[in-house]
């Protein structure tokens, strides 16, 4: 019997026999494999697409659309659908490019956690970006040109955002061209107000994205980029006068108070909760859009506030960052 002793710590006998319990344990342990693309869980796809931010995309579309005079409801629905595909495709592409980084630092993300293969994510992103850009391009020549510029910014940001210090500008460019694409689909097209609105939204996104970079690359938080979060308030005061200025000031107060509430978690809390701040500021994009159309009838506000609340609710189930 001594010649058939158990090898210490291994549970396998020296004569090569495997104990029955160990055999069942080995048989019951499946090999770790990536599920096929069509088998990826719905939650995996929702997390990859960061769908909790989609209400902010629809809000951008509505703001640009209204600034250009609106138009047929069917065109607006088509616009939102195309923008949705581009956004989700861009988020998929972001994870595909970041797979190596996530494997080292964020193993809970879908690709390093084996919830879906990197190859499948590449395929999803290509299909979504192509489909969304095509849908936006169908809205007209100007829309097609702007949609291609939007696509270029999305791809450049996803490919280089880890290596470029000024990548927040690329992220801001994505929202800039989204608003202009939405305006180009309206009856009046892109005008000066739509251009300025897209620009100040871009400033807000630069400040937001600067903070988001600190979430994955901790370091000293500088205050000056956060000043850009106030850019929409300045434009609202300049372009609205009389009765509309009162509405703009009210909307500005809402935006400002929300931004301060979000920043409190990072600037006046130890340790800083940067993710919480960024998520709140992302939802606040809907309030910035509301500020851009302060001269619209009161019932229009309901749609932007609805997008804001929906974004916050979705963040309870799917991370925004």
Each language-model region and where it sits:
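Acidic (Asp/Glu-rich) catalytic motifs at the cytosolic membrane interface
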Residues: 83-113, 120, 208-219, 318-319
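Residue-level signature of transmembrane alpha-helical entry/exit and packing/kink sites
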Residues: 44, 53, 57, 75-79, ...
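Multi-pass membrane catalytic core of lipid/isoprenoid biosynthesis enzymes
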Residues: 81-82, 99-154, 169-172, 178-180, ...
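Short, amphipathic, aromatic/basic-enriched membrane-interface segments that mark the entry/exit
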Residues: 44-52, 95, 111-121, 139-140, ...
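Membrane-embedded alpha-helical segments that form the functional core of polytopic membrane enzymes
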Residues: 58-97, 129-137, 144-157, 196-207
């Amino acid at each position: 019997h001594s010649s058939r002793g158990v090898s210490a710590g291994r549970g396998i006998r020296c004569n090569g026999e495997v104990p029955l319990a160990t055999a069942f344990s080995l048989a019951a342990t499946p090999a770790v494999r990536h599920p096929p693309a069509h088998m990826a869980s719905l939650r995996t796809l929702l997390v990859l697409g960061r769908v909790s931010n989609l209400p902010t995309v629809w809000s951008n579309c509505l703001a640009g659309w209204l600034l250009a005079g609106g138009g047929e409801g069917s065109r607006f629905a088509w616009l939102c659908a195309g923008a949705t595909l581009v956004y989700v495709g861009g988020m998929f592409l972001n994870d595909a490019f970041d797979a190596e980084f996530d494997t080292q630092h964020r193993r809970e993300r879908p690709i390093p956690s084996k919830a879906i293969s990197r190859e499948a994510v590449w395929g999803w992103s290509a299909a979504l970006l192509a489909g969304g850009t095509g849908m936006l391009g169908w809205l007209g020549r100007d829309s097609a040109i702007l949609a291609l510029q939007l696509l270029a910014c999305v791809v450049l940001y996803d490919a280089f955002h880890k290596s470029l210090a000024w990548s927040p500008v690329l992220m801001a460019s994505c929202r800039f061209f989204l608003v202009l694409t939405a305006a180009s689909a309206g009856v009046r097209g892109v005008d000066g107000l739509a251009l300025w609105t897209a620009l100040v939204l871009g400033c807000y996104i630069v400040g937001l994205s600067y903070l988001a970079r600190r979430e994955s690359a901790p370091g000293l938080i500088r205050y000056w980029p956060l000043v850009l979060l106030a850019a929409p308030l300045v434009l609202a005061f300049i372009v609205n006068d009389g009765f509309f200025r009162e509405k703009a000031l009210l909307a500005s107060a809402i935006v400002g108070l929300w931004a301060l509430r979000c920043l409190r978690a990072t600037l006046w809390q130890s340790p800083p909760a940067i993710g919480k701040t960024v998520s709140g500021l992302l939802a606040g994009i809907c309030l910035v859009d509301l500020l851009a159309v302060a001269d619209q009838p009161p019932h229009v506000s309901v749609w932007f506030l609805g997008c804001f609340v929906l974004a916050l609710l979705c963040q309870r189930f799917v991370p925004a960052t």
